[in-house]
Amino acid sequence: MENRNTFSWVKEQMTRSISVSIMIYVITRTSISNAYPIFAQQGYENPREATGRIVCANCHLANKPVDIEVPQAVLPDTVFEAVLRIPYDMQLKQVLANGKKGGLNVGAVLILPEGFELAPPDRISPELKEKIGNLSFQSYRPNKKNILVIGPVPGKKYSEIVFPILSPDPAMKKDVHFLKYPIYVGGNRGRGQIYPDGSKSNNTVYNATSTGVVRKILRKEKGGYEISIVDASDGRQVIDLIPPGPELLVSEGESIKLDQPLTSNPNVGGFGQGDAEIVLQDPLRVQGLLFFFASVILAQVFLVLKKKQFEKVQLYEMNF
């Protein structure tokens, strides 16, 4: 009896451990496969290449627009908004990893000048917190606080992303100066077409790997197709695998050529990048400018008063 209870307890513990392991694997795998910024973080030390191209474009092949809006100038140690807009047709549906259709997600990378960083929560005003919503930003690297990533997040809710940014203070950071700085941004809507290892996702076109005749099209049980192509010249058979998602454009008995599209292009998203400029303004320069404007206004006032006084003197002399 005691041995039976011991066996039951061991069996229960093993089952629980296996279940927990499976849950952890699924959660981890899902988060990595869906989160495009993680791909960039894992594969590239810097998201912006020397050519100016942001590396996210290596996986998101379609070119789409983005828009970045920042203040023209900011003072040191000041929180300001950087607003990224990722426009797209909200009615569109994308092909998900399982081949079904679903809403588009969005993601972004913001490359700030050295010294600029994400504003700490205690410096963000309630109004700005409301604009940000439930978004959670993270640094590209622990030592690159000026590069921020976000996503994937639902596109219908966050096609406009507000970044809370804290400007640096040159008095505290000697490598920061009062200058005009560039800001770079990249934003995507929808899934990519290529994974970092070079393999295709199911959100792209699949082409024939051989010239020949489509001998057989087998629909797989879990979705997708297995296409047998026979080369008419030597009888060699090639099998092309199509994952769930793309729609077939060929049929059995059809003659095809090398690199001919076997499927439609299911991709409705894309990636875009842009840039803006911001001036880190010296407060003393602003004060000097205000003093100059005040001096000009006072000079104008005194000039008008002097003119009025001169006109009165002239009028007095004419009366005599």
From Swiss-Prot:
Keywords: Chloroplast, Electron transport, Heme, Iron, Membrane, Metal-binding, Photosynthesis, Plastid, Signal, Thylakoid, Transmembrane, Transmembrane helix, Transport
Cellular compartment(s): Plastid, Chloroplast thylakoid membrane
Protein name: Cytochrome f
Entry's Gene Ontology cellular component terms: chloroplast thylakoid membrane; plastid
Mode of membrane association: Single-pass membrane protein
Pfam families: Apocytochr_F_C, Apocytochr_F_N
Top-level taxon: Eukaryota
Signal peptide: 1-35
Gene that encodes the chain: petA
Family membership noted in the UniProt record: Belongs to the cytochrome f family.
Cofactor: heme
InterPro entries xrefs: Cyt-f_TM (IPR024058), Cyt_f (IPR002325), Cyt_f_lg_dom (IPR024094), Cyt_f_lg_dom_sf (IPR036826), Rudment_hybrid_motif (IPR011054)
Oligomeric form and interacting partners: The 4 large subunits of the cytochrome b6-f complex are cytochrome b6, subunit IV (17 kDa polypeptide, petD), cytochrome f and the Rieske protein, while the 4 small subunits are PetG, PetL, PetM and PetN. The complex functions as a dimer.
Record keyword 4Fe-4S present: no
Binding site residues for heme: 36, 56, 59-60
Cofactor descriptive note: Binds 1 heme group covalently.
MF (Gene Ontology): electron transfer activity; heme binding; iron ion binding
PROSITE patterns in the record: CYTF
